[in-house]
A protein has these predicted regions:
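N-terminal amphipathic, basic-rich helices that act as targeting or association modules
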Residues: 2-170, 437, 507-524, 535
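A glycine-rich helix N-cap at a beta->alpha junction
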Residues: 172-184, 264-275, 300-304, 628-646
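Cofactor-binding active-site loop characterized by glycine-rich and histidine/acidic residues
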Residues: 84, 89-101, 105-115, 122-265, ...
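Short secondary-structure boundary/capping segments
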Residues: 168-172, 257-262, 286-296, 313-316, ...
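Non-catalytic terminal/interface segments that mediate subunit docking, oligomerization
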Residues: 79, 83-105, 126, 144, ...
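Active-site phosphate/pyrophosphate-binding segments
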Residues: 191, 490-496, 504, 632-684
């Protein structure tokens, strides 16, 4: 045993909590950190990583699990104060504008409720996401210009009143329209509940409800943009996909189940912003755990860059004096259910539960009064912390980024709503609450106007309005926005398909006829480049493997191996400029690719023609919600269900027998359905 080993503190389980042992152990850890700092100072970052990897391998080889340690960082902001950039805007002015938007968003729902028609609406979600949305819209999310492709903003669906409220201030929506929230058939028009492009085609780029659709569609929008660039159809002028999501909807399998492709294909044009207000519709997201830590591990393990925004600036002085990480350890151990409890507790009660019997932590917390402790901000309401996170995410290279932002559901709505389990269902307020909130937000309305939830608009020449317009002009225009200018294609003459329309002298399957048509169209100089074959790992089933060598399978990294069938007439050919989207066994991802390709006329000004070919039973029945979303997004393309019928695949069992897809498809209003039996019907 070496001399240094003799000095390492050793304790049994019943001694490890003693004050003496804890002091010795903190000193030991401090020495290790100092040693690591010395390595960092003397060598490069690469050597530090190599050393840590060696230590990790040592621990694993001795049966010590490190899964939590390697995938989770402490429960604090990822970006320390020392690396925080200066804020480029006027926080006081931006807060005034945000308060006006908050009031009008709330007023929309209150006015709808006051009609007594049971229209519904949601107030609490936007209340929690308002600051992060405003920081993004004032400083980051760019519109399309001559030199920039433009960003796509996909919002958390329940926060739509806030986006409508901002568009109203910007002059993009009339007072009649926002006054008719959820009443679209009124004489002067109205607004749909959530982002529906078919209902408001000038505003919403993509449908983000129902929950779960936003994540998967945003991933595949980002991926399709890279696809277009790698095929030389879209110039590399930038453009990011910003997806704002809720922590509750991250449980949707369509979201978490598709995040791997984003890191695998290095989608650095994709940013997820997860609003971690710790609550879903009925109660806590993870009352017995920590949703931010859970999501960090999931995304970090999938190869994403993870940025956490948990604490506001008021915590920075406390971190500075937390030399022994006493406060940090308390932050790490408190559960989300307890953090939610803090949001509805007095400062005195918070302090008692937070400090318990820890004298050192109590000493740190004496720097805050009970009132200050009650009002201290979470990171999601701190402009500076949000700006730092968005700034780093927007500069990411080679990886997608997820920003996990801690907020409070119902923030600013008073003690009757903030952090309460009923916050999501809050649709009205008492007269006293309305007046109190208006006063707190600084809205200059009379008591009667507050009670009636009157909309408030500053003078067009006011400082607030000038600032808001100026910030959007700097970023190229207003957001969110959907474009309709695109290049059109002329349909090929029918005589190009004479091989099929004139009849064939022998019986062939309609699937074979379809593959031959696709092969012919891919060779057409006018429409061939715009064709996007999409296959969920069923190309050989449908006899489409011959297209592999003709069109190539898209892979952003090309093909760095020799396929086992390299010497055959239809080798598995992957290429950076490949045309076929081989989605693997992921129908949700395939439909998301179909949506991205079929709406390329809007987001990329290209008339792409997606043709998604699948086992018919795994179409409408498997991803019907995504198909409906494609209709809402006004997607243009062809869905081809192969091997249909109740008897076609009898041996496969009832889960493969399809006699009802057309019944399911018939309820999608803008989806035309056919059941072709002959090759000429496919051609026509």
């Amino acid at each position: 045993m070496t001399e240094s080993q003799k000095n390492i503190p050793v304790a049994s389980d019943d001694q490890s909590d003693s004050h003496e042992f804890q002091n010795e152990w903190r000193m030991e850890m401090h020495e290790w950190v100092e040693s690591l700092q010395a390595v960092k100072d003397s060598y490069s970052e690469r050597e530090v990583k190599e050393l840590l990897r060696e230590l990790q391998n040592f621990a694993l080889s001795h049966g010590i699990s490190l899964s939590e340690a390697t995938l989770n960082t402490p429960y604090r902001n990822t970006i320390p104060l020392s690396e925080q950039p200066s804020y480029p805007g006027d926080i006081e002015m931006e807060s005034k504008i945000e308060n006006i938007i908050r009031w009008n968003a709330m007023a929309m729902v209150l006015q709808a409720y006051d009609l007594g028609e049971g229209l519904g609406g949601h107030i609490a979600t936007y209340a929690s996401t308002a600051t992060m949305t405003e920081v993004a819209l004032n400083h980051f999310i760019k519109s399309r210009t001559e030199n920039y492709q433009g960003d796509m903003l996909n919002i958390q669906a329940h926060s739509s009143p806030g986006i409508y409220s901002r568009a109203f201030l910007e002059g993009r929506l009339s007072i009649e329209e926002i006054g008719n929230f959820r009443r679209e058939l009124q004489k002067d028009g109205g607004l749909p509940s959530y982002p529906h492009p078919r209902r408001r085609p000038e505003l919403w780029p993509s449908p983000t409800a129902s929950m779960g659709l936003n994540g998967v569609s945003s991933i595949y929008y980002a991926r399709f943009s890279k696809y277009l660039e790698n095929r030389g159809l879209l110039s590399k002028k930038g453009g990011k996909i910003w997806a704002f999501l809720g922590d509750g909807e991250m449980d949707e399998p369509e979201t978490i189940g598709t995040i791997n492709i984003a890191s695998r294909e290095k989608l650095d044009n994709l940013i997820f912003v997860v609003n971690c207000n710790l609550q879903r519709l009925d109660g806590p997201v993870r009352g017995n755990g920590k949703i931010i830590q859970e999501l960090e591990a999931v995304f970090r393990g999938s190869g994403w860059d993870v940025i956490k925004v948990i604490w506001g600036s008021e915590w920075d002085p406390l971190f500075a004096i937390d030399q022994n990480d006493v406060m940090q350890r308390r932050m790490d151990e408190v559960l989300d259910g307890e953090y939610q409890m803090y949001s509805v507790s007095s400062g005195e009660d918070q302090r008692a539960h937070w400090v318990k019997d820890n004298n050192e932590l109590e000493s740190i917390m004496t720097n805050l009064s009970n009132d200050e402790l009650k009002d201290i901000k979470r990171g999601g309401f701190d402009h500076k912390k949000l700006y730092a996170a968005f700034d780093r995410a927007s500069k990411s290279s080679g990886k997608p980024t997820v920003i996990l932002v801690k907020t409070l559901k119902g923030y600013g709505l008073g003690e009757g709503s903030e952090g309460r389990n009923i916050a999501h269902q809050k649709k009205t307020m008492s007269d006293e609450e309305r007046v109190e909130i208006a006063e707190r937000l600084g809205i200059p309305l009379s008591k009667e106007e507050c009670i009636s939830a009157k909309f408030y608009v500053p003078d067009q020449d006011s400082e607030e309005m000038r600032y808001m317009h100026k910030m959007r002009q700097k970023l190229g225009g207003y957001q969110p926005v959907r474009h309709e200018e695109y290049k059109s294609l002329k349909a090929p003459d029918l005589n190009q398909f004479s091989d099929f329309t004139d009849g064939i002298d022998r019986s062939i399957s309609t699937t074979l006829a379809l593959v031959r048509m696709m092969s012919k169209m891919l060779r057409d100089e006018k429409i061939g480049p715009y064709l996007v074959p999409i296959i969920p790992d069923e190309a050989r089933t449908f006899g489409m493997d011959g297209l592999f060598s003709q069109a190539g399978i898209y892979s952003p990294s090309g093909q760095n191996y020799e396929p086992v069938d390299a010497g055959t007439i239809s080798p598995y050919k992957e290429a950076k400029d490949g045309q076929i989207l081989q989605e693997g066994i992921c129908e949700a991802g395939a439909l998301a690719s179909f949506m991205a390709a079929g709406t390329a006329y809007s987001h990329s000004e290209l008339p792409m023609i997606p043709i998604y070919i699948f086992y018919s039973i795994f179409g409408m029945q498997r991803v019907g919600d995504m198909v409906w979303a494609c209709g809402d997004a006004m997607t243009k393309g062809f869905l081809i269900g192969g091997t249909a019928g109740r008897t076609t695949l009898n041996g496969e069992g009832v889960q493969h027998q399809d006699g009802h897809s057309h019944v399911l498809a018939s309820v999608v209003p803008n989806m035309m359905t056919y059941d072709p039996a002959f090759a000429y019907e496919l051609a026509v």
